[in-house]
């Protein structure tokens, strides 16, 4: 399992709460949501750099990118698009107030627009692993999302697979052996291929994490262009300033059975 299982009663209680809160928010006049032109969703295996990229995109004045809200889950529960947009904006505000912290890192970008926006054009969610797990459980969700959350633009961040696997295998939260982590990743990538088969090529953007770290300004500008927004120089400089020049090298921390 990727995450500890949540008791069914608690999951249903959270959905009921979110339905009521987002329903009330959706009834209010929200001219700020009227300009949304694209929906951005992440897709892929964990520990590949999705959280950093999502936090940097959320720092853009015309974008809101939530942290692991789980859009497919809400669409499966029959939430309206407007309700989901309200939940995404609220999630981004909370994450910004917390400093966009993830594991041991803060992805806060001082002086930029995390948790708020101006002239909103793009809204989405950073939950690449969660998206694939939702589709594994409900294969019809991809088609539903493409219909109800259109137009959807996907971002897939990839990293040296040995580093990503080692990060999962050494995580105290996940508690997976290297062999189980490998099997888990294989399942995710099989699902990823099924999803890719339903997407137009121009709706999937591949971003290599190591290349991003080498040239964060250039790669971030390319990502913004894919999403249809300009990338101001001040925004790019502020985002590049928080990026580590070298990722944690974790592949040497675990040993795998050669036969695995």
Question: Predicted segment positions?
Answer:
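PAPS-dependent sulfotransferase catalytic core
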Residues: 1-115, 239-256
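PAPS-dependent sulfotransferase catalytic domain
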Residues: 117-234, 252
């Amino acid at each position: 399992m990727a995450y500890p299982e949540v008791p069914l009663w608690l999951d249903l209680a959270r959905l009921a709460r979110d339905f009521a809160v987002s329903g009330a928010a959706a009834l209010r006049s929200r001219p700020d949501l009227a300009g949304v032109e694209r929906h951005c969703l992440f897709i892929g295996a964990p520990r590949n750099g999705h959280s950093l990229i999502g936090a940097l995109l959320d720092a853009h004045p015309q974008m809101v990118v939530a942290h692991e809200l789980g859009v497919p889950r809400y669409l499966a529960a029959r939430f309206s698009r407007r309700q989901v947009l309200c939940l995404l904006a609220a999630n981004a505000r909370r994450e910004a107030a917390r400093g966009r912290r993830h594991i041991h890192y803060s992805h806060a970008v001082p002086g930029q627009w995390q948790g708020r926006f101006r002239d909103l054009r793009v809204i989405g969610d950073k939950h690449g692993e969660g998206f694939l797990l939702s589709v594994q459980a409900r294969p019809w969700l991809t088609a539903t999302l493409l219909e109800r959350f259109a137009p959807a633009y996907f971002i897939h961040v990839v990293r040296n697979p040995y580093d990503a696997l080692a990060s999962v295998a050494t995580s105290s939260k996940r508690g997976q052996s290297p062999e189980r982590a490998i099997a888990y990743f294989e399942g995710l990538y099989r699902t990823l291929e099924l999803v890719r088969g339903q997407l137009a090529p121009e709706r999937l953007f591949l971003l290599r994490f190591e290349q991003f770290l080498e040239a964060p300004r250039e790669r971030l500008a390319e990502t913004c262009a894919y999403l249809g927004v300009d990338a101001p120089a001040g925004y790019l400089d502020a985002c590049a300033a928080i990026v580590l020049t070298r990722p944690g090298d974790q592949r040497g921390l675990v040993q795998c059975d050669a036969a695995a």
